[in-house]
Swiss-Prot record:
Gene3D superfamilies: 3.30.60.20, P-loop containing nucleotide triphosphate hydrolases (3.40.50.300)
Binding site for Zn(2+): 147, 150, 185, 188
Recorded family membership: Belongs to the thymidine kinase family.
Name of protein: Thymidine kinase
Organism expressing this protein natively: Chloroflexus aurantiacus (strain ATCC 29366 / DSM 635 / J-10-fl)
Length: 193
């Protein structure tokens, strides 16, 4: 058994839509840049909400990134990076187990791996890769939004179709913004039926 290298770690930033996950990832990466550490930031090919080649928060913060589809793509571009940041982990085309293995592989080689993404899908079920990384990470930060219905802390992403909750048999992944999703608390969240 090999011992993880000094300095390698996995940090997870998770939460519902509009909780500030990408904003926090960008904040951490700005610190990395100030510290003059080598880094790569990756964004999924599937996320077409903003400009390609950038991670972008809903509030408008942006950093340059490499657009990729799979963990294999990430590993191919991550050489010599001290820090690897992966935004919107749940949107990658790869098998969740491959995403987890890749993050572990990087961390075991001394890389600081920062991942951000939804912990729950619109059905309030855990995304598989995120579920495993939450258990394996050295640091976990769960962020909260504000429920659009009552103002409490929101932990759920309510997907809407024509103003009504999406049915349970709708596709799990649909990239969208304020026109499709609302942040809701446990009480105001309406389960998919």
């Amino acid at each position: 058994m090999t011992r993880p290298s000094d300095g390698g770690r996995i940090e997870v930033i998770c939460g519902c839509m509009y909780s500030g996950k990408t904003e926090e990832l960008i904040r951490r990466m700005r610190q990395v840049r100030i510290a003059r550490q080598s880094y790569r930031i990756f964004t999924p090919r599937m996320d077409t909400r903003y400009a390609e080649g950038q991670v972008a928060s809903h509030s408008g913060s942006r950093l340059e990134a490499i657009t990729v589809a799979t963990m294999k793509d990430i590993l191919a571009h991550a050489e010599d990076a001290q820090v690897v940041a992966i935004d919107e982990l749940h949107l990658f085309d790869d098998d969740p187990a491959e995403m987890v293995r890749g993050c572990q592989w990087l961390a075991n080689r001394g890389v600081r791996v920062i991942v951000a993404g939804l912990d729950l899908n619109y059905r309030a079920e855990p995304f598989p890769a995120m579920m495993h990384l939450l258990a394996l990470a050295e640091q976990v930060d769960k962020l909260y939004a504000i429920c659009v219905k009552c103002g409490a802390y929101a932990t759920r992403s309510q997907r809407l179709i024509d103003g009504k909750p999406a049915p349970a048999d709708a596709p799990t992944i649909v990239v969208g913004g304020l026109d499709m999703y609302e942040a809701r608390c446990r009480t105001c969240y309406e389960p998919a039926v």
